[in-house]
Amino acid sequence: VALLGSSADETALKLKGKDATTVILMMGLQGSGKTTASHKLAYRLKKEGRNVLLVACDLVRPAAIEQLCILGEKVGVPVFTIPGEKNPSVVASKAIEKAKRELYDTVIIDTSGRMHLDDALMEEIQNLAKVTNPDEKLFVADAMTGQSAVDIAKEFDEKVGITGVILTKFDSDTRGGAALSL
């Protein structure tokens, strides 16, 4: 299907070689599945031989850091955190420093979301993108969101630029909602 990409080059993640650090920024609304998608992506990349570091930058949702740590431990991928830090850009930049120093070739940054688009969320994501200069900016959307997912994706694309989309919870709705729209 041309909509989904007509070649593997169009749909594959743009990963640098193992001698450099690829940074992947995960973004989307609260509850879209960013944390779970982050750990699943980390697991896949680890199985492909990448040395992955997950970064807990959702400093808004209670227990988000703990959730990512539990999921990371389940798949054998370390999670970078700075207990008590309130600025996700500080956490992300320190994580990338660690990744380069300790030869991680892939960094996946799990970010916070909000129930609805707002200026605070977009500013936080823009700051993270500016500080981390990510190679991939993946928009995570709940497949059941429907047409509003397109409007939300457009906003993220205009403010930050989207390089890819991950649809989550695809198994919970037979209609697929946002799948073809995105």
Question: What does each model-found stretch correspond to?
Answer:
Residues 1-57, 64-84, 91-101, 105-111:
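Primarily NTPase-proximal linker/entry elements flanking Walker-type ATP/GTP-binding cores
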Residues 30, 55-60, 82-84, 111-113, ...:
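G-domain G4 guanine-recognition motif of GTPases
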Residues 35, 61-62, 89, 146, ...:
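Short alpha-helix boundary/capping motifs
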Residues 41-46, 89, 123-126, 159:
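Alpha-helix termini
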Residues 62-65, 117-119:
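Conserved D-loop-proximal element of ABC-family nucleotide-binding domains
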Residues 86-90, 119, 147:
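Conserved phosphate-coordination/catalytic loops
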Residues 104, 116, 122-130, 134-182:
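Conserved phosphate-handling catalytic cores of large alpha/beta enzymes
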